Regions:
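Active-site neighborhood of HAD-like aspartate-dependent phosphohydrolases
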Residues: 1-41
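Structural signature of beta-strand start/N-cap positions in the alpha/beta core
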Residues: 3-4, 96-97, 104, 130
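Short beta->alpha linker loops
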Residues: 19, 43-47, 71, 86-90, ...
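Alpha-helical substrate-recognition element adjacent to the catalytic core
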Residues: 22, 30-59, 68
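Hydrophobic packing residues within well-ordered alpha-helices of enzyme cores
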Residues: 24, 52, 91, 116-120, ...
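A short, Lys/Arg-enriched amphipathic alpha-helix followed by its capping loop at the start of a domain
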Residues: 26-31, 93-103
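Metal-dependent phosphoesterase signature
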Residues: 34, 56-92, 101
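Substrate-recognition "cap/lid" segment bordering the active-site pocket of phosphatases
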Residues: 85-86, 106, 112-146
Length: 146
């Protein structure tokens, strides 16, 4: 018997992945690099530590990943605050159905907790979730998640 439903966030609940390529390409240009779209796409679903290691391996140790993540947070937050959280079609209806069936729900994501909470607040979905687990809360993120 199914007792709970666990959702991934980026790409499943919210269409935030479409912001990743232009955001990271903007950041890399500002820092003096050119980041191919394919490189950004390979970031999807992975934790910050693993992505940062790949960035440094690919672009060099001098790539300031800490600044890159700060800029990413700033640019994505600015976009979402201006345009709203891009919900995937049918999400609210699905969540209502799951609640009607009495099932618990949770989010499992590599996104930082403060951003998850911000997106949920902006989209009005906070009350639909019973728990959140982020990549920072587990010892090993994708591709071998705990």
């Amino acid at each position: 018997m199914i007792k709970a439903v666990i959702f991934d966030m980026d790409g499943l609940m919210f269409d935030t992945e479409r912001l990743a390529v232009p955001t990271w390409q903007r950041i890399s240009r500002e820092l003096g690099y050119e980041m191919p779209a394919e490189f950004v796409i390979n970031m999807f679903g992975r934790n910050v530590s693993a992505i940062s290691a790949d960035i440094k391996k690919t672009f060099g140790e001098e790539f300031d990943t800490e600044l890159g993540w700060k800029l990413r947070k700033q640019y994505v937050t600015e976009w979402i605050d201006k345009h709203g959280v891009p919900l995937k079609p049918g999400l609210k209806e699905l969540l209502k159905y799951i609640r009607q069936k009495g099932l618990k729900t949770a989010i499992a994501t590599s996104t930082d907790l403060h951003l998850v909470e911000h997106y949920l607040n902006l989209s009005g979905l906070t009350d639909y979730y019973d728990g959140i687990v982020t990549g920072q809360m587990v010892a090993q993120g994708k591709p071998a998640p705990d």
